[in-house]
Each structure stands twice: as C-alpha cells, then as structure tokens.
C-alpha cells in the first residue's frame, strides 16, 4: 500500500498486484 507499492490495491500508488 502507498508509494512503496505493497499488495494493497487501494494504496495511492499501488497496482492490484502490488507493483512498486
């Protein structure tokens, strides 16, 4: 989740698969 792109698709910069 968030700018790091963890597995949370609702993070501001996260893809559904948790892309960075």
From Swiss-Prot:
Residues 1-20 are annotated as: Disordered. It comes from Xenorhabdus budapestensis. Its main location: secreted. One of its GO terms (cellular component) is extracellular region. This is Antimicrobial peptide EP-20. It comes from the Bacteria. Keywords: Antimicrobial, Fungicide, Secreted. The keyword Secreted applies.
């Amino acid at each position: 989740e968030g700018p790091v792109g963890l597995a949370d698709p609702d993070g501001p910069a996260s893809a559904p698969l948790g892309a960075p």
